Amino acid sequence: MTKVHFRSYIHKKMILFPQRIDKDIAEDDPVRLLDALVDNLMLDNVYKLYKPSGRKPYHPQMMLKVILYAYMNNIYSCRRIESLLKRDIHFIYLAGYEQPDFITINRFRNRVKKEINNIFTQVVLILAAKGLISLDVEYIDGTKIESKANKYTFVWKRTVEKNRAKLQEQIRTLLLQVDDVIAQDNAAKTEGIEFTAALLDEISKELNKSLESAPEPKTKEEKQAVRTKKKQLKELENKRNKLQEYDQHLEIMGERNSYSKTDPDATFMHMKEDAMRNGQTKPGYNLQIATENQFITNFALYANRTDTLTLSSFLESFKSRYHRYAKTVVADSGYGSEENYLFMDIHNMEAYVKYNYFHKEQRPRYTPNPFSPASLYYNKEQDFYVCPMGQHMKRIGLKRSLTSNGFVTYSVRYQAERCDGCPLRGSCFKARGNRIIEVNHQLQHYKQKARELLTSEEGIKHRGRRCIEPEAVFGQTKYNKAYKRFRHFGKDKVNMDFAFFAIAFNIGKMCRKTNLKELKAVMELLLVTFRCFIQVYIGYLKPNKSFYMKLAA
């Protein structure tokens, strides 16, 4: 029988000369591109977070590389990163054989939570310098991501206000029952006013003094009266504590309608994932992102459930990040409001933003309602509408409305004449008297402008791209990257965690669209100019306004 010869296998052999750690890593591996990219980031503000005294900390560059590479590979657990630093060659290469534990990794993330946004901005500017994005267009969309908090930790504003009102009446009734002179005087003073914890504390102190200065009870009835007073005093103190609790709930909530006890920054919202199909609300955040070529160029977290109230502040955050507004904004009908259209008009943005019923209007079989105000003939010069029967609807007044965001809208009211006996009345309207319509002319103007933009050749192109821009990024985020729920408590930590994710997401996509040689060539050409460019944007330097305008052009 022929002898089989195997390759030499001595797994415990010693090597005379140490080998390079990256010997077995491919030249075009994403870990090399990440390594080169982080080496060229400006981390001066991160270095300032460390104290010169004490034990030498791990290098921030190494920590940043390790965490970003973990996020690129769907690894978000610090314990898992600690484990991979001991056995994964890519992590060992980035760490240079350093092995920080999970506590150190988590502390680093918390340490840089205020500076990670600057690092995200630098990475986006590298993408712009590479020509992968232009920062001239924003494809905007939002999604709700569940918080780490439990879904049964809710506090509802309406419930708190209702119980607080009941408590006020209970306190007023209790004060009337106290037969002490001081309590009666205070009850008279507080008749019809709202009680506060400070006022109840003052009343309790006076009642305590009254009980202490009272003579020693001798008879059975006197002792019973003292016990009753003490019981009432104890009840008053309990109600004071409850009032403090309600006031604290309302202070934490602010303008919101709810919050979570374990994550006060989270608001209860309806999520898309509803396994029970009962419309149950869960604590979460409204995540807004802007994309271009499926790169995340901006992001922000909001407590508002609706996207309409977030657009203007989100566009402002883009300006604060890059010192200029985007030239073009593309969004769905959830953002089409008068306030948002006005904001984009003031700042000279092309608003490819849909409004309600836009898709319905574009259907081939769509026929507009002949009785709706939008279908009626309007004489702009004399300011009147004409109903389907030819009757003039004259202007009768102006209605002022205030949105939940504090924006003031004005609607003009028009009233028809002689609606009694009209053969079309049953189809036109069913209220008594003559028909009254309300028309917001400014909103109608912006809708017409948006309709012209959206149905143009450029608008059709943007509408087609919007479906594959933020929607695709959300799909990759939730399903390919398994980033369906935040893993931290508090808005600042949640913002930090998503900033790490967004940086890793952009670098991963960059790796698929470029190679290491191209990146190094760009880095060598732009090393001097680009570092100054980055310094200006993240606030290290303070140049004049003309220099900003030149960079933003």
How does the language model describe each region?
Residues 1-32:
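Hydrophobic alpha-helical membrane-insertion signals
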Residues 3, 50-54, 458-461:
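A ubiquitous short alpha-helical element
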Residues 7-8, 67, 74-87, 98-553:
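Anion-binding and metal-coordination hotspots
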Residues 26, 54-62, 73, 77, ...:
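Generic, well-ordered alpha-helical segments
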Residues 26-68, 441:
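Basic, short loop/linker segments at the boundary and entry of helix-turn-helix/winged-helix-like folds
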Residues 91-96:
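Secretory-pathway/luminal and periplasmic proteins that interact with or process carbohydrate-rich
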